[in-house]
């Protein structure tokens, strides 16, 4: 491609969210920035957000951040992101606007600017019980409005695409599956010194399986806690994630069943420490009831861990055929699957190597190239 394309991005989550939507946005924009094509990447955020997140991509080639001109109140920031941003996009001659977190501003279609939206999941429609009633209604309304505005929709898994087609009644030609890549830090092997520093910092046990993700009902980590009762007594579970009200339920179970010496819950863990945490675990456990994709699975496999997940959504797409999957309500089955992938289990190393080969399809350059082809197609 010879002519430069100016791409605008919804960067609110990029500068505010450490995991999930924020991680997706930062990784994709970084991968696009390193393509050899002539691109201008303009990131539109209502404010500068968190320095430690913005700095991960600020200063990369072709990237510039854009903010509202005035010093505005929070409700005005929301209005700007919802509609007012379109004026700035037109002024900046943006050709394609990409809503990275399932939303597009009102009026984007009328402006003549082409638009792409990434839909991560439709859990608020599939499982509204995991959301406050009003939140589920708002998310559903935004989804239906957004798919009418979008020129093209990216689903981050085949599972999400099926949900979009069924629940959004969208023409299949408007939806493409483009998987998510993980941050490059997970492909670098931590040094023994780095591992020991992290072990001492968090007081890690000698043997453990790991879970990473928000500690919420949908993520279902209580199943992992219950599975520990059927696993060797020298094996622990380390849970890394943001606390929610569900965390209290997990803590109550741990206390009632005297598992406090075998279950460790860590929060506010910096991204930089995660590779060393993964590297010291024996396996990764991800018993989520429903996901849009499951990027921690890719991170774990990149770090050389076997994975045990649950059936029922998209986790088989992320983990591939050499990860193990059980029903999300069967702690005994989860315990049995974990036993199959602990150190010393037959075929463990071969399973890890095949899984590493499988996740090559999620490499950042390939993902960025697929997204760029969508931009070019709709122009």
Locate predicted features.
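Carbohydrate transferase catalytic cores enriched for Leloir-type hexosyltransferases
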Residues: 1-379
């Amino acid at each position: 491609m010879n002519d430069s394309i100016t791409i605008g991005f919804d960067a609110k989550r990029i500068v505010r969210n450490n995991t999930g939507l924020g991680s997706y946005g930062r990784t994709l924009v970084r991968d696009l920035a390193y393509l050899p094509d002539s691109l201008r990447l303009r990131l539109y955020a209502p404010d500068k957000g968190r320095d430690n997140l913005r700095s991960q991509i600020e200063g990369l080639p072709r990237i510039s951040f854009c903010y509202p001109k005035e010093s505005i109140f929070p409700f005005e920031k929301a209005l700007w992101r919802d509609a007012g941003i379109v004026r700035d996009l037109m002024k900046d001659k943006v050709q394609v606007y990409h809503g990275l977190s399932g939303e597009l501003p009102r009026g984007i279609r009328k402006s003549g600017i082409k638009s792409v939206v990434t839909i991560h999941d439709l859990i608020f429609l599939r499982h509204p019980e995991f959301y406050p009633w009003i939140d589920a209604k708002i998310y559903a309304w935004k989804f239906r409005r957004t798919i009418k505005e979008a020129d093209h929709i990216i689903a981050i898994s085949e599972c999400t695409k099926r949900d979009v087609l069924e629940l959004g009644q969208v023409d299949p030609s408007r939806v493409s599956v483009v998987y998510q890549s993980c941050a490059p830090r997970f492909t670098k092997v931590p040094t023994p010194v780095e591992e020991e520093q992290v072990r001492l910092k968090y007081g890690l046990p000698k043997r453990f399986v790991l879970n990473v993700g928000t500690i919420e009902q949908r993520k279902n980590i209580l199943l992992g806690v219950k599975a520990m009762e059927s696993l060797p007594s020298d094996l622990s579970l380390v849970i890394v994630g943001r606390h929610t009200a569900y965390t209290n339920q997990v803590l109550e179970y741990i206390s009632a069943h005297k598992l406090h010496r075998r279950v460790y819950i860590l929060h506010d863990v910096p991204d930089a420490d995660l590779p060393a945490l993964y590297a010291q675990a024996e396996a990764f456990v991800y018993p989520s009831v429903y996901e849009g994709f499951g990027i921690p699975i890719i991170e774990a496999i990149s770090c050389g861990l076997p994975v045990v997940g649950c059936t029922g959504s998209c986790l088989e797409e992320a983990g591939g055929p050499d990860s193990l999957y059980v029903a999300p309500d069967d702690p005994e089955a989860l315990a049995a699957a974990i036993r199959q992938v602990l150190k010393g289990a037959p075929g463990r190393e071969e399973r890890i190597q095949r899984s590493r080969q499988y996740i090559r399809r999620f490499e950042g350059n390939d993902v960025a190239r697929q997204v760029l082809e969508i931009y070019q197609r709709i122009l």
